From Swiss-Prot:
Pfam families: YidD. GO terms for cellular component: plasma membrane. Keywords: Cell inner membrane, Cell membrane, Membrane. Disulfide bonds: none annotated. This is Putative membrane protein insertion efficiency factor. It comes from Prochlorococcus marinus (strain MIT 9312). It is found in: Cell inner membrane. Belongs to the UPF0161 family.
Amino acid sequence: MFKTINKSITSILLFMISFYQKWFSPFFGPRCRFIPSCSSYGYEAITRHGPWKGGWLTLRRLSRCHPLTPCGCDPVPD
């Protein structure tokens, strides 16, 4: 049952990120200070690590993405 819940949450989160990338991101233009972009990072983190750890990694990344942070490469950890 827990695996089913994880798969459902993963699907919902990935859909939300894909929806953002397709419908909202083109209007805002490139704003992320990191490579890969925050939405790509979130998609990869959730795909690799599941909804809980991947979601936490994504939230940490989003909290670091602001004008006072230096730009750079920030890949998803293994």
